Swiss-Prot record:
Position of the signal peptide: none
Bias kind Basic and acidic residues: ranges: 104-116, 218-232, 295-319, 1569-1611, 1621-1664, 1679-1689
Residues the entry annotates as binding ATP: 755-762
Subcellular localization(s) per the UniProt record: Nucleus; Chromosome
Bias (Basic residues): 52-62, 251-266, 354-364, 676-687
Descriptive protein name: Chromodomain-helicase-DNA-binding protein Mi-2 homolog
Length: 1982
């Protein structure tokens, strides 16, 4: 367009180009359609992109300074095309005056609209008819025609008129109507036509702005070049219109105008100034050509363009402009004036990367002065007058204060922008706010930069590759904008390389260009949804543009200076090469086909050869053009990486895979092979493919025979023929296994193949299934469930041994599995609906074998469970040992015809787990667990094994390596003991000291905390760098690895390992190193790196193909890998590493079975050398003890099949944990003693590695091998070897001292606390931590020093009597003093010796804590005879001859163990207890019952012993114990003076606690033998709970002992008992027992069913009267007993109880009184005895009758109450059922008196013993009922009055009352009293009615009684609750201390850890003080 300012073109380089600030508003899509012009002039305007397409302009530099301005970023275009291309405009700009304003823009808009008016847009009539709106004819006045020259003004005028006539018109329709009116108006308005002509003559609307000639020029200082495009103006107007319509809901753009005042200031740059970014790059040339269409029709313009082309051609010869970069329009287009255009250079700028942008707005027309200061106009912008004006800081304008709106009184402070700048933000853009970067994109530096015309990037010319010498002419596009698009979507970058840049390449921005200008990076790209065959090299810049995030991530991950190196070239010795060749043979390739090409193109660049091998074609589809695509599954890639390939693609093996697929499909879908499409894609085949077709061996799908071809009963003598093609050979035993499997399948017997690990169970299974398939017996489908880690190996074996199987591996993520379900399960369409897991709707299966993992069996059960499986194979079948597991339950729901289980460990020695395995295998045969366990109850081990073999024989086959591989190399295992390093010792001590409180807590620490401590100690034994504190301080070498010397010296194991590996490497051995901890493997990696050994590694994080690849690399012939690092758990399954012959177990697993599996990785088929196994164990550490205990526990699980014990073998109890933690700590804290330290020099290491060493001898039995595996190599240590004849099976934990940690760690802990306190600076003093709960011993005297403390532990029992000495000990004491001292030292040494091991084998016999079978039997017999052993068993007749050789400590430890076993839950038919001790037929119920009965008897005798004396007939003895009694009085009187209170060591109070406690247990079944008991049924129920009651009473009595008030009256007596000599011990013990026993019956004690009211009264009465003599005590007791006899009514029953009970109780009381009086008369001494049975037995009835007959003179001859007491006393003395011993004892002579008359009879003894037994059973029953009544009274039990039994009782009482109250009527009636007679008849009628009612009630009574809850339930005495409470820990520290006070002073040192509060503490309640009538007892050691 020509204009008056064309002459200023020569000054354009000096003028600053400005962009117009015209506002823009949004334009809705609805308004675009009618406004879009069809001519070429408006092609720049795209209605769809009206909001996005903005034209950016390049600004010229001025005064030689090439300054650029950054363009504003615009929004990304929604269209992908638009986002890739950008439009460029003519860059010609014109200077203009400052008065050029809005009018000029309006004229341009009018011109633009006029041009578009003739573009065929819809007219007003068209719009009205289309939208059904009413047209309004508008008359315009001349004034309106002159003023309405802009679309905006016209719209404001017309729109209200149109809207008034069409009130409901939609806004978009109204806009279109207004636009149509505007076009019509423009055609008729002459004013607009004139301006439009001027505009039209200028040429294109998008190139220059028209300026009318009559417009005045403004001064130069305010002149502004506003080059605005008419399409922008039109776009702005339409957007403003839409903005007004929508009431400014989307105010994205700011309108500008001088007359607008209400706009708020904005800090943002107006949108019109936003320049285009480099997103829409490539449509610029087209658009510019279109945009110039109108001007080309002008002849002047055509002439100018011709000149321009000639100039361009001349310039191209001179300027080296890259053709690739210059894709835009010519650099300069003419301005339509017809004058030649001056060529301009590409835009440059001076960049300053440190420049900060000014936040204030500045206008572009801001001229600068000479010194760079801005020049403002010197007159007011409003009034055009000078004077005092204020200057705008962002533009040249100036204003008077009064001319502003609103007026200002004073100039504003700070920077100020004028109203024009505030309103018109478009002109206020900061001058230097250029869109382009201020720094070079390559080097990030500033300076002179070359700016891209399509994006904000800027570059130095020398940073480009190749560099540019000159600035290119015209538009220049950077290498990023000019790079071509990618051929597809990149999926991943495989690798990169340096590539030489060709000379014709355009400039690049490669980062490597500075170092090497000739090199650029290229990346090897795997395309999305394309196979690896299509990978390509892509230049870096191309990838950087299209995938910036991908390349950034890759660059962060890899070194970008040196390309990564992949596998070495394939050679002939590489197994990978052989495998590839085998695959090639299968697909018919020549061995050398393109091998070099593939190696160079793919293998060296990180593409594995397997990824290029077609595994199979899984589906196909046909395109519309007839071509066929095939879905290809690639080898070793998941199914979701399958790709669609064309049939004609040059892919090796694809043609054969297609043939196989089509053959299989034809067979499965019953199609003929002719239906297969044979046409291939048109075009020339590659040479490779032609050769492939010619030379490949044709291999098609061969279906199996339709009918069986062989008999399954016929065995294979040799390998079957169908295996010959595989080239593999089966072992003879494997053929035998296959025969057995085939036979079992034919017979329908589900099987377990249980061959030992390494015998090839996988191969046998695969071959078995293959034989069924190939011989026509079964086509499948076969389901094989295996561990995930072994799945790849299984897949490989199927491929190798069963090549014709269609085996699919159902594994991977959900996408992979969806592909499998859709393509691999069936050929039928719609068999699976959608990608979700759903039911398979077909029975035509495509596959033969489906290989999957356990987890997917459960996850995808909806699909897999819908298939009818022919055979199920489960590898590692011990996963099915629990029927509660999800895998078991879901797999059990599958439809399976035959099951085969594979396991190397078929029996985990647990009947329940074995049953679950068999139940899964054969549900019909094994379905009753109880019956199954019952078959093995109470039978010997041999019988169990025999039955198991009979049961499992048809189902299981098990062969061992020793059975079938006699020529297999042997293995030797060595335990290598290693010393702790100095750093390890430091950390070991610190860990123990830090955890002192946990170790020394009252309960011995919780199991969880102890396990945590143990794990820390194990980590310390492995390496101290496993702790962060040590790792942080460790020295590191280059690369971040630990420095090798310090790393090795820090751990004793690594020192030895380093020496071993050097020699092993020199001898060409290969090593497996196992460790539990993956972090330890990390340290070993650093160690191996430092030693420069090559290695492989497998742990839990390496699975699937990565695992198998590592194994293959290690097993490859000639492999350089020397060491294989494995984690014990992850490396134990499905791994074959037979190329290694040395196994080092760095740290043993908790479960030794895992270690066995681990070293079986090397000792298996294929091993050619002897296998040496070295197990590192740190000496004197927790590790050594863990290994011992774990192995022994593992051995116990092999001793017998027993329930309730899992197969893990390493579940440690808390006591065992404590014992493990103690091991070796004492030596650790001693001063460094180098004498016993183990040092390995080179000679010792060589001897260790000598392969001629036998090591641990081979055993035929695995169990024996395990037993003997703990022998230590002789050279490994200087310490003594263990005795060979004693084989320790299990070391007990009972020999631990509760104060051990206090003695060992207290001083260290206190020192540590002080150090910590000092480190905290000033503050509160850290008080000494004192533990008051350590078994009472420590609490007794906390001021003792450590040495005294330790000495006390071993001196507690040094003064026991000689009766407990070993045989022959008496002779030593008969010698002189020297011999006596010698014997005493021997006794002390024997007592100080540690306890024997818990289990040991001596001479083939098992010993338990040193007790052989005979001694254990003797101990049990003593328990059954006397009940619980007393405290001083060594001084009583309890200690039988067989037990006298045991020390008291050993004896008490065995007692504690025995009682723990009694309270252990479990079935009596089990052969061992939980800790492995043989049960030996012990019946827990019978033993507990006997203990309880003996406790009841002992309690009853002790109750009346001090009244009745010790002799039944004192007249038979001259002096009946007068000296004894006097001595007792003296001792008691002497000890009464200093009474003590509080907690006392209550050795004598054990009787208190136990007497009532154990009195709970009634007799077992014999109690119900007594037929005379009228309440026989209830008695039976009581009998059932006998043992339970005894145990409850123990616990409750233990609680009683904890009450402080209970001890007040005990102390004098206890002290008396403590100081008594052995001669009078028993008498004193009797007194001591009686009084504390009565005192402990405190009414406040909860859960005390054993306490009678009379005993409570005794306590109350005795408190104010201290016992002065025994006689007084006896008198008191007699009185109290009589009173309590009367008080028995409320104690036996509540007020609601039966009256019969009350009556019987009162009768018993009367009898008691009478008996007492008789005894006093005859013997001159008191006698008292009673059993308050509540009338539930016939005892009191008998006593009444007998005492009536026992007239004076015949008291001894008639058996009555007195005889019963002495019978019980005799049983206490001589034991249960020892009738003859009792009769022969003179103390119980009264028992013989009633039988003197029968002496002459022949069966005299039989009569006598039968009577005694019957009588004793009656007494036993009475005692049991008495105890139960005590419980009922304590629990306040009352019968419900509405209960039928109670109503019957009430009626009986009514009858009784009625009869008794009317007895006189009978006499009066007989006397003839008629009124009395009448009354008598009424009474009799009442009695008859009552009796009739009672009769009917009695008939219902049996059913009612049957519903009564058992006695045990009503008395809250269930066995489980009793045992759980019995095993409960003590509630607090004081309770624990009081509990232990019942034991002898040193007993704490002999018990389990935490015995004070653990279950063992409560076992003491079984132990009453043992006393015998007539003897004095002594408690030694008190």
């Amino acid at each position: 367009m020509a204009s008056e300012e064309e002459n200023d073109d020569n000054f354009q380089e000096e003028e600053e180009a400005q962009e117009d600030n015209a506002p823009a508003a949004e334009l809705s899509n609805d308004s675009d359609a009618p406004l879009k012009p069809n001519n070429d002039e408006d092609d720049d305007y795209d209605p769809e992109d009206s909001r996005r397409k903005k034209k950016g302009k390049k600004r010229k530099t001025r005064k030689g300074e090439e300054k650029g301005r950054k363009k504003k970023k615009r929004k990304k275009n929604e269209s992908e095309e638009d986002s890739d291309f950008v439009q460029h405009d003519e860059e010609v700009e014109y200077p203009s005056t400052s008065k050029r304003g809005r009018k000029r823009k309006e004229e341009k808009q009018a011109a633009k609209e006029k041009e578009s008016a003739s573009s065929g847009m819809p007219s007003v009539e068209d719009v009205c008819s289309a939208f059904s709106v009413c047209n309004v004819e508008i008359e315009y006045s001349e004034e309106e025609l002159q003023s309405l020259t802009t679309y905006k003004a016209f719209m404001h005028h017309v729109r209200p008129i149109l809207q008034k006539e069409n009130p409901k018109i939609a806004a978009p329709k109204l806009v279109m109507l207004v636009a149509a009116k505007w076009r019509e108006f423009c055609e008729s308005n002459p004013h607009i036509q004139q301006e439009g002509g001027a505009a039209g003559s200028g040429g294109s609307a998008g190139q220059a702005r028209s300026v009318t000639g009559d417009e005045p020029e403004e001064p130069r200082s305010s002149r502004s070049s506003r080059n605005e495009k008419p399409d922008d103006i039109y776009e702005e107007a339409v957007e403003e219109e839409e903005e007004e319509e929508e009431e400014e809901k989307k105010p994205r753009r700011k309108r500008s105008g001088r007359g607008k005042k209400g706009r708020r200031p904005s800090g943002k740059v107006p949108t019109l100034k936003i320049k285009l970014l480099g997103k829409r790059k490539r449509d610029s040339s087209d658009e510019e050509q279109d945009a110039s269409g109108a001007s080309e029709r002008d002849s002047d313009l055509e002439f100018e363009r011709m000149l321009q082309k000639s100039d361009d051609s001349a310039d191209e010869k001179e300027a080296p402009v890259s053709s690739k970069a210059d894709n835009s329009a010519p650099a300069a287009q003419d301005d339509g004036s017809g004058a030649p255009v001056v060529r301009k250079k590409a835009k440059t700028k001076i960049g300053n990367k440190f420049k900060k942008k000014n936040k204030l707005k500045k206008t572009k027309n801001f001229p600068e002065g000479e010194d760079g200061e801005h020049e403002h106009q010197d007159y007011c912008e409003v009034c055009q007058q000078g004077g005092e004006i204020i200057l705008c800081d962002t533009c040249p304008r100036a204003y008077h204060l009064v001319c502003l709106e609103p007026e200002l009184d004073e100039p504003p402070e700070g920077k100020w922008s004028c109203p024009h700048c505030e309103a018109d933000g478009g002109a206020a853009e900061e001058e230097d706010d250029d869109e382009h970067q201020e720094f070079c994109r390559v080097c990030k530096d500033g300076g002179e930069l070359l700016c891209c015309d399509s994006c904000p990037s800027a570059y130095h010319t020398f940073c480009l590759n190749p560099p540019l010498d000159t600035i290119p002419d015209g538009d220049w596009r950077c290498p990023r904008c000019s790079c071509p698009p990618l051929t597809g979507k990149a999926e991943k970058i495989i690798t990169w390389r340096w590539a030489q840049r060709s000379n014709d390449d355009g400039p690049s921005t490669s980062k490597g260009s500075k170092n090497s200008n000739s090199r650029v990076r290229e990346y090897f790209i795997k395309w999305h949804n394309m196979s690896y065959w299509h990978c390509e090299w892509v230049p870096e810049v191309q990838l950087d543009v299209h995938h910036p995030l991908m390349i950034r991530s890759f660059q962060r991950k890899y070194d970008m200076e040196e390309p990564p190196k992949f596998e070495e070239s394939l050679d002939e010795a590489d197994t990978r090469y052989k495998r590839i060749q085998r695959h090639k043979d299968k697909v018919g390739m020549k061995a050398n086909d393109d091998a070099e090409v593939l190696e160079e193109r793919f293998y060296k660049n990180g593409v594995k050869p397997e990824w290029l091998i077609v595994q199979r074609v899984i589906n196909h589809r046909t395109a519309r053009d007839g071509s066929t695509m095939y879905l290809v599954k690639w080898r070793e890639l998941p199914y979701d990486k399958s790709t669609w390939e064309e049939e004609g693609d040059d892919i090796q093996g694809l043609r054969q895979a297609i043939d196989y697929y089509q053959d299989l499909r034809a067979v499965c879908t019953s199609e003929t092979t002719q239906s297969r499409s044979k046409k291939s894609k048109k075009g020339r085949k590659s040479k490779l493919k032609v050769e492939d077709d010619e030379d490949r061996p044709v291999k098609h799908y061969t279906p199996p025979p339709e009918k069986p071809t062989t008999d399954l009963k016929k065995k294979y003598e040799d390998q079957p023929a169908f295996l010959e093609g595989t080239g593999m050979q089966l072992h003879p035993y494997q053929i035998e296994g296959i025969n057995w499997l085939r036979y079992s399948w034919g017979q329908g017997i589900d099987t377990i193949l249980a061959d030992e690990m390494g015998l090839g169970k996988t191969i046998q299974t695969v071959t078995f299934l293959y034989s069924l398939y190939k011989e026509g017996h079964c086509r499948g489908p076969f389901l094989v469930a295996v561990p995930l880690s072994t799945l790849v190996n299984w897949e490989r074996e199927f491929e190798l041994w069963a090549p014709d199987f269609y085996c699919i591996t159902y594994i991977g993520d959900k996408d992979s599995r969806a592909v499998i379900r859709e393509n691999e399960l069936s050929f039928e369409e719609g068999a699976i609906r959608g990608s979700k897991v759903s039911r398979l709707r077909t029975t035509q299966y495509k596959f033969n074998v489906l290989l999957t993992s356990y987890e997917l069996i459960s996850m995808d059960a909806a699909c897999l469970g819908s298939i009818d499986w022919a055979v199920l194979v489960v590898d590692e079948a011990h996963r099915l040992k629990s029927n509660q597991s999800k895998f078991f339950r879901i797999l059990n729901s599958y439809t399976i015809a035959y099951k085969l289980l594979l396991t190397g460990t078929p029996l985990q020695n647990n009947l329940e787990e074995l049953f679950h395995l068999l139940n899964f295998l054969s549900r019909d045969k094994f379905n009753d667990l109880q019956a199954f366990q019952g078959e093995f109850a109470d039978v010997s081990k041999e019988e169990q094994v025999k039955r198991l073999h009979e049961m499992l024989g048809p189902h299981m086959l098990r062969r061992l390596k020793t059975d079938v591989l006699k020529n297999m190399p042997s293995k030797s295992e060595f335990i290598v003991r290693v010393e702790l390093s100095a750093m390890q010792k430091k950390f070991y001590k610190f860990i123990l000291t830090k955890n002192y409180e946990a170790l020394n807590s009252k309960s011995g620490g919780g199991s969880c905390s102890l396990i945590n401590i143990m794990m820390d100690l194990k980590k310390c034994c492995n390496h101290p760098y496993l702790f962060p504190s040590a790792a942080e301080e460790a020295t590191t070498a280059a690369g971040g690895l630990y420095e090798i010397n310090s790393l090795t010296k820090a751990a004793g194991k690594l020192v030895l390992l380093s020496k071993m590996l050097k020699q092993l490497k020199a001898q060409n051995h290969r090593v497996l190193i196992f460790s539990q901890m993956t972090k330890m493997l990390d340290i070993l990696e650093d160690f191996l790196e430092g030693e420069q050994y090559k290695y492989e590694r497998i742990d839990g994080g390496i699975t699937g193909t990565l695992r198998q690849e590592a194994i293959d690399r290690f097993n490859a012939p000639g492999a350089q890998q020397f060491v294989f690092l494995l984690s014990t758990r992850a490396g134990g399954l499905g791994i074959n590493l037979a190329t290694a012959d040395t196994v080092i177990i760095y740290d043993s697993d908790w479960n030794p079975h895992n270690d066995i599996q681990a070293f079986s990785r090397a000792h298996r088929i294929g091993q050619a050398n002897k296998v040496m196994i070295y197990r590192f164990v740190t000496r004197n550490s927790v590790e050594e003890r863990v290994t011992q205990v774990a192995k022994r526990k593992m051995m116990l699980t092999h001793l017998v099949v027993r329930p309730g014990m899992g197969g893990k073998g390493a579940n440690f109890t808390k006591q065992e944990l404590d014992d493990i933690l103690r091991f070796g700590t004492e030596d650790l804290f001693k001063e460094d003693d180098k004498e016993e330290a183990i040092h390995y020099d080179d000679k010792a290491v060589a001897e260790l590695l000598d392969r001629t060493n036998r090591g641990i001898e081979e055993k035929e039995s695995w169990a024996n091998e395990y037993l003997s595996s703990f022998k230590v190599a002789s050279y490994a240590t200087k310490e003594e070897e263990e005795e060979e004849e004693t084989e320790i099976i299990k070391q007990d934990a009972e020999n631990s001292d509760p104060a051990y940690w206090v003695k060992l760690l207290r001083h260290h802990y206190e020192q540590h606390q002080e150090d910590v306190g000092r480190s905290l600076g000033k503050g509160k003093r850290v008080r000494k931590q004192v533990n008051y709960t350590d078994g009472g011993v420590v609490a007794a005297d906390t001021t003792r020093d450590d040495s005294n403390w330790q000495d006390n532990g071993s001196e507690y029992n040094s003064e026991y009597s000689a009766g407990s000495d070993e045989d022959g000990g008496d002779d030593d004491f008969d010698d002189q003093n020297g011999a006596e001292r010698k014997a005493k030292r021997r006794l002390e040494r024997r007592d100080d010796r540690p306890l024997p091991p818990l289990l040991a084998r001596v001479g083939g016999n098992i010993e338990v804590l040193g007790f052989n079978a005979r001694q254990r039997k003797s101990f049990l017999n003593a328990i059954m005879r006397y009940g619980m052993p007393p405290q001083d068993a060594f001084n009583s007749q309890w200690l039988v001859r067989d037990l006298r050789g045991k020390s008291e400590r050993n004896f008490k430890a065995y007692v504690s163990l025995f009682m723990r076993h009694l309270c252990e839950p479990g079935a009596d038919n089990a052969e061992t207890f939980a800790d492995g001790v043989p049960r030996e037929g012990l019946s827990r119920q019978h033993v507990l019952t006997r203990i309880g009965v003996m406790s009841l008897i002992r309690k009853k005798v002790q109750e009346f012993e001090h009244i009745n004396g010790y002799y039944s007939m004192p007249e038979l003895i001259l002096k009946p114990c007068e000296p004894v009694r006097s001595a007792l009085k003296q001792d008691v009187a002497a000890l009464e003076a200093p009474p003590t209170g509080g907690n006392v060591d209550k050795s004598a109070t054990t009787s208190n606690s136990v007497t009532p406690a154990t009195s709970a247990a009634p007799s077992p079944a014999p109690a119900s033998e007594k037929g005379e008991d009228k309440d026989k049924d209830s008695e039976k129920e009581k009998d059932k709970t006998s043992a339970e009651k005894s145990e409850v009473k123990q616990e409750q009595e233990a609680e009683e002992d904890k009450k402080p008030g209970d001890v007040k009256q005990e102390n004098p007596v206890e002290e008396a008992a403590g100081d008594t000599k052995p001669s009078d011990a028993e008498v004193k013990t009797e007194v001591a027992k009686t009084e504390p026993k009565e005192e402990t019956k405190d009414p406040e004690v909860k859960e005390e069913p054993k306490t009678e009211e009379k005993e409570k009264e005794k306590v109350d009465d005795k408190k104010p009267i201290p016992p002065t003599t025994v006689i007084d005590d006896d008198d008191d007791d007699v009185m109290i007993v009589k009173e309590d006899g009367e008080l028995e009514k409320p104690s036996a029953s509540s007020p609601k109880d039966q009256k019969a009970v009350a009556a019987a109780t009162s009768a018993a009381t009367g009898a008691t009184g009478k008996g007492a009086e008789d005894s006093l008369e005859v013997l001159k001494r008191k006698f008292m005895f009673n059993i308050a049975d509540g009338g539930f037995t016939e005892l009191h009835t008998l006593w009444l009758n007998e005492e009536k007959a026992a007239v004076p003179g015949r008291e001894y001859e008639i058996w009555h109450r007195r005889h019963d007491y002495w019978l019980l006393a005799g049983i206490v003395t001589h034991g249960y059922g020892r009738w003859q011993d009792i009769q022969n004892d003179i103390r119980f002579a009264i028992i013989n008196e009633p039988f003197k008359m029968d002496v002459g009879k022949g069966n005299f003894l039989e009569i006598k013993n039968k009577f005694l037994a019957r009588r004793f059973k009656l007494l036993e029953q009475a005692l049991v009922i008495e105890e139960q009544l005590r419980r009922a009274a304590y629990l306040n039990l009352a019968q419900d009055p509405s209960h039928p039994a109670m109503s019957l009782n009430a009626r009986f009482a009514e009858v009784e009352c009625l009869a008794e109250s009317h007895q006189h009527l009978s006499k009066e009636s007989l006397a003839g009293n008629k009124p009395a007679n009448a009354v008598l008849h009424k009474v009799l009628n009442q009695l008859e009615e009552l009796l009739s009612d009672m009769k009917s009630d009695v008939s219902r009574l049996p059913a009612t009684l049957a519903r009564i809850p058992p006695v045990a339930q009503r008395l809250q005495m269930s066995e489980r609750s009793i045992l759980s409470r019995l095993a409960a820990t003590a509630g607090n520290a004081s309770n624990a201390a009081q509990l232990m006070a019942q034991f002898p002073a040193g007993f704490q040192g002999t018990t389990l850890p935490a015995f004070t509060s653990g279950p063992a503490g409560n076992f003491a309640n079984f132990r009453p003080q043992f006393s015998v009538p007539g003897q004095l007892s002594n408690n030694s050691g008190v």
